[in-house]
């Protein structure tokens, strides 16, 4: 059986899309995690000048941003395990499903990391001035984190079906 670029069902380039899905899951979630970590860390450093005793309590946004990168790692490893050679029956349908899974996880992670960074920065600065804001900041951070979790769940459903 020969595989050429004209064969629609088992195209030789189908695994490319699957690997692009795995790569995009990792790349975009790590970009979101990096932004969230950096933005939150700037707020922690600014707050630490006024209230150094609150630094350890304010590390929560940085930890939550780092978890976003783990979501991408999980999805990328699952997708990598599902991609096969075109000669083994890997078709364009699977390739596009894996690309969609990777983009779903990656872009949800990017948005979640962005939200965590902004909320974390403003939240730790506000908590330094008014400690009652801490609970509200944590709730908003949880809602932001769940956006990345939703993306991972949808990506796992797309990637394993």
Curated annotation (Swiss-Prot):
It is a multi-pass membrane protein. Gene3D superfamilies: lithium bound rotor ring of v- atpase. The chain crosses the membrane at residues 16-36, 59-79, 99-119, 138-158. Belongs to the V-ATPase proteolipid subunit family. One of its GO terms (biological process) is necroptotic process. PANTHER family: V-TYPE PROTON ATPASE PROTEOLIPID SUBUNIT (PTHR10263). This is V-type proton ATPase 16 kDa proteolipid subunit c 3. The record marks 145 as: Essential for proton translocation. One of its GO terms (molecular function) is proton-transporting ATPase activity, rotational mechanism. V-ATPase is a heteromultimeric enzyme made up of two complexes: the ATP-hydrolytic V1 complex and the proton translocation V0 complex. The V1 complex consists of three catalytic AB heterodimers that form a heterohexamer, three peripheral stalks each consisting of EG heterodimers, one central rotor including subunits D and F, and the regulatory subunits C and H. The proton translocation complex V0 consists of the proton transport subunit a, a ring of proteolipid subunits c9c'', rotary subunit d, subunits e and f, and the accessory subunits vah-19/Ac45 and vah-20/PRR. It comes from Caenorhabditis briggsae. The lineage of its organism: Eukaryota, Metazoa, Ecdysozoa, Nematoda, Chromadorea. Signal peptide: none annotated. Vha-11 and vha-3 are transcribed on a dicistronic transcript where vha-3 is the upstream transcript and vha-11 the downstream.
